[in-house]
């Protein structure tokens, strides 16, 4: 909605100088990437949090004398299906593109954008996005390969 409102506010006549400015695929598709991340969050929360909080289908387990819902069972069941593992890994790829653009844009918004610091900021931002997404993707892959029957 924000992207659509911004386009309407600009009108038909472009006011920005765009010649010679290169932009990444991620920067041109932030609305799509944000929508896909929202879709993933809704699926993820529905699959785990709602089942844990309000579902009665999870088996119970006793930990330190306290009976609790077995969330490990839910995670292992979910990540035993290849299509769900692929969905989670692709979602982390979407998150990667979103973060790579978002981190550098955040520094630019704060006014930290010059020839000296920008390449280092982009490198650290890309590295951070890669490590975060690698960590998120590792969980479903590990469950699928090593912990499911």
Per-segment meaning from a language model:
Residues 1-149:
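Membrane-embedded alpha-helical bundles that constitute the cytochrome b-like, heme-associated redox core
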């Amino acid at each position: 909605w924000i992207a659509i409102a911004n386009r309407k506010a600009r009108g038909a006549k472009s006011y920005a100088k765009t010649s010679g400015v290169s932009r990444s695929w991620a920067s041109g598709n932030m609305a799509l990437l944000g929508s896909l991340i929202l879709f993933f969050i809704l699926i993820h929360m529905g699959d785990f949090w709602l089942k844990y909080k309000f579902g009665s289908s999870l088996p119970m387990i006793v930990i330190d004398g306290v009976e609790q819902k077995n969330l490990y069972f839910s995670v292992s069941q979910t990540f035993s299906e290849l299509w769900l593992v692929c969905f989670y890994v692709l979602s982390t790829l979407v998150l990667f593109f979103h973060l790579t653009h978002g981190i550098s844009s955040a520094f630019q918004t704060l006014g930290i954008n010059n020839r000296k610091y920008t390449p280092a900021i982009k490198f650290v931002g890309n590295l951070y996005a890669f490590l975060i997404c690698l960590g998120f993707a590792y969980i479903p892959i590990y469950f699928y390969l090593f912990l499911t029957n």
